[in-house]
């Protein structure tokens, strides 16, 4: 009788314990939103918001942060010149996603004293308090210093973000914490002369360890092939993948018109 009672109690408790992967709707769900597309300000710092044209206040949306590179700004993420708009993710999202492009301080993400992490925390609070977001479906991506900031989020906000995609990043925005698992995609050019290729591999290896993946060598393409090689690590608690491509320090790997990074990032996010 006692084991049966214990089992029943466990079942009852489980009904009130949400799964880690279960959708958690933000407080903005069901509200008539006041935030609109365009530039918004939090304590003197700006970000660009892009809400889907067919926004439904009762539908929980993905939330994606697009982070700019050193010397860039939030407008570079949306103008479609150095990269496809929103790193090519908006067209793939097909109305399922709210996008945010924060503006770095002094055209970068030094994250002194964690100020850039705090800024992103504040954006999340503002956006999710007004719009309907699936809080288990937050993502970040960026190139160069934006990649470094995405890596920093993976380190310190692994429990708040579902996955990151780091394009040619480095440890340049810090790594506070850095012990929790998170789905991690790295994309890096084998001839990167700014943030070396091996450094990008090392970033991924941190999450190979955190996610308890089996160790494996990262594959690389032949120089001059204009190709790429993807390594998917095995046995991970959360997925870790790394794409090495034949190129340098490129905001858009293999060119602005290439689907390599946008396709890989979007599919990785949705499968994480």
From Swiss-Prot:
InterPro entries: AB_hydrolase_fold, FaeB/C/D
SUPFAM superfamilies documented for this protein: alpha/beta-Hydrolases
Reaction catalysed by this enzyme: feruloyl-polysaccharide + H2O = ferulate + polysaccharide
Subcellular location: Secreted
One GO cellular component, as annotated: extracellular region
A Gene Ontology biological process term: xylan catabolic process
EC nos: 3.1.1.73
Keywords annotated in UniProt: Carbohydrate metabolism, Hydrolase, Polysaccharide degradation, Secreted, Serine esterase, Signal, Xylan degradation
Main location: secreted
Signal peptide: 1-22
Function, in words: Involved in degradation of plant cell walls. Hydrolyzes the feruloyl-arabinose ester bond in arabinoxylans, and the feruloyl-galactose ester bond in pectin. Active against paranitrophenyl-acetate, methyl ferulate and wheat arabinoxylan.
Recorded family membership: Belongs to the faeC family.
Protein name: Probable feruloyl esterase C
């Amino acid at each position: 009788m006692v084991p049966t009672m214990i089992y029943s109690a466990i079942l009852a408790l489980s009904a009130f314990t949400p799964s880690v992967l279960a959708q958690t709707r933000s407080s903005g769900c069901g509200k008539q939103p006041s935030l609109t597309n365009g530039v918004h300000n939090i304590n003197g710092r700006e970000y660009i918001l892009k809400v889907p044209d067919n926004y439904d206040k009762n539908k929980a949306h993905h939330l994606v942060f697009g982070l700019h590179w050193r010397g860039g700004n939030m407008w570079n993420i949306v103008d479609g010149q150095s990269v496809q708009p929103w790193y090519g993710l908006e067209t793939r999202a097909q109305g399922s996603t709210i996008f945010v492009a924060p503006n770095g301080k002094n055209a970068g993400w030094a994250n002194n004293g964690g100020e850039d992490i705090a800024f992103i925390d504040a954006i999340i609070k503002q956006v999710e308090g007004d719009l309907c977001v699936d809080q288990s479906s937050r993502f970040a991506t960026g190139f160069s210093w934006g990649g470094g900031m995405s890596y920093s989020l993976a380190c310190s906000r692994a429990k708040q973000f579902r996955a990151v995609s780091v394009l040619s990043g480095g440890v340049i925005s810090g790594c506070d914490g850095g012990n929790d698992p998170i789905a991690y995609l790295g994309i890096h050019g084998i001839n990167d002369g700014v943030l070396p290729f091996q450094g990008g591999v090392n970033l991924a290896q941190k999450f190979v360890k955190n996610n308890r993946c089996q160790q494996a060598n990262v594959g690389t393409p032949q120089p001059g092939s204009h190709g790429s090689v993807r390594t998917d690590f095995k046995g991970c608690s959360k997925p870790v993948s790394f794409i090495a491509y034949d190129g340098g320090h490129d905001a858009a790997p293999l060119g602005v018109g290439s689907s390599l990074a946008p396709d890989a990032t979007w599919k990785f996010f949705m499968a994480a």
